[in-house]
Regions:
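Short coil turns that connect the paired helices of HEAT/ARM alpha-solenoid repeats
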Residues: 56-60, 96-104, 129-135, 173-181, ...
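Bacterial N-terminal signal peptides that target proteins for export
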Residues: 1-10
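Bacterial N-terminal signal peptides
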Residues: 9-18
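Amphipathic alpha-helical scaffolding segments comprising HEAT/armadillo-like alpha-solenoid repeats
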Residues: 32-52, 78-98, 118-129, 150-174, ...
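Structural detector for internal amphipathic alpha-helices that build alpha-solenoid repeat scaffolds
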Residues: 31-41, 51-85, 104-118, 124-127, ...
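N-terminal low-complexity, Pro/Thr/Ser-rich intrinsically disordered segments
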Residues: 27-29
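Long internal repeat-built scaffold domains in very large eukaryotic proteins
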Residues: 196-337
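Boundary at the C-terminal end of the N-terminal hydrophobic targeting segment
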Residues: 20-24
Length: 337
């Protein structure tokens, strides 16, 4: 055995290890309030390394690059200074990749931008919602759910104005989108936005966006599916508020519940019966809670029994109850047109 060569190898390993120990990882930096020039240089180095891996388009490289760049944002306490600095560098490097002809690259790049959760990274996601490719639009919508989840779990690096811009973009997205799965993801993003800066009315805006979608002529999306999802979310918002939801939220919940009843009535003989029964129950429960919140009519006393009407395939009975509900929604305290 060549002991000289072995000794040299050991020394080399020790030197490499000592360098690595002296060099902070991105995850180590994530909790720092003050970033040094060396920290910024290391961020640059790792951003360049992993974005280059993603750019190759090789599935394994894309996965490894994405995981390396999102891992720092999984820390319990990601500071705003780190998020802003890492975000600044990442957005610059990621921007050309978000429009890559390789959908795998574009989607994973948007996912990273969502975890970064800054003003600049949000702009990439809003642009992604307009991409002509459905998988990329889905990636952008999902990344917005991650962005708002990040804003909830640590000090947010987005403003109320940023949230407003995202909500407007999601409303536009819902109005134009034909795929119910993508709309469902947009609903998730808008619900999560409620806890972001300036996002308190996000669920209301989501509900009204779905109502407008359902009322639209020639809407290709599955109206029953998306309206049912919106009603469940608004029901949960009302329940979570313990009777103290803002009046606007209660009205929006009632409006989308009324729209769901219209959808159920129109699809009574064509849609899956179990799905209709579940939707009818959600609509009636949501109306009841909304009216109670607004000190409105006693919905329970109306004995709507919507689910029973659906179960019995009672078209006439369901139509009559739907008319009663719509009449209530047009009067005080709802005043829905």
């Amino acid at each position: 055995m060549n002991w000289s060569r072995l000794a040299s190898a050991v020394v080399g390993l020790l030197i490499s290890a000592s360098c690595a120990l002296g060099q902070a990882s991105l995850s180590d930096m994530a909790s720092r309030i003050d970033l040094s020039d060396a920290d910024r240089a290391e961020i640059t180095k790792q951003v360049d390394r992993y974005t280059a891996m993603i750019a190759t388009g090789t599935p394994a490289n894309v996965r490894d690059g994405r995981e390396a760049l999102t891992k720092p944002f999984e820390a319990d306490k990601v500071t705003v200074p780190f998020r802003v600095e890492a975000g600044r560098q990442l957005v610059e490097a990621l921007k050309p990749l978000t429009t890559s002809s390789n959908e795998l690259v574009a989607v994973n790049t948007l996912r990273i931008a969502g975890e970064v959760a800054t003003t600049n990274s949000m702009a990439l996601l809003i642009d992604g919602l307009k991409d002509p490719r459905p998988p990329v639009r889905m990636g952008a919508a999902y990344a917005l759910t991650r962005l708002f989840a990040q804003a909830r779990r640590s000090a947010p690096a987005i403003s109320a104005g940023d949230t407003a811009s995202a909500l407007k973009a999601l409303e536009t997205f819902i109005a134009a989108e034909r795929d119910a799965r993508l709309i469902d993801t947009a609903i998730s993003a808008m619900v999560l936005a409620a806890k972001a800066p300036g996002g308190i009315a996000a669920p209301d805006r989501m509900a009204r966006a779905i109502v407008e979608k359902a009322r639209g002529k020639g809407a290709e999306a599955d109206t029953l599916t998306i309206t049912s999802r919106a009603v469940r979310e608004m029901r949960d918002v009302l329940i979570g508020s313990d009777g103290k939801a803002p009046p606007g939220t209660a009205r929006a919940a009632a409006e989308v519940a009324g729209q769901l009843i219209v959808a159920i009535k129109s699809q009574l003989t064509t849609a899956d019966k179990e799905a209709l029964i579940t939707a009818a129950g959600s609509a009636e429960t949501t109306l009841t809670i909304a009216s109670t919140t607004l000190a409105g009519p006693d919905i329970a006393a109306m004995k709507l029994a919507l689910a029973d009407k659906v179960r019995a395939a009672d078209q006439d009975g369901l139509s009559k109850q739907a008319e009663r509900v719509l009449a209530v929604l047009k009067s005080e305290p709802f005043n829905i047109k």
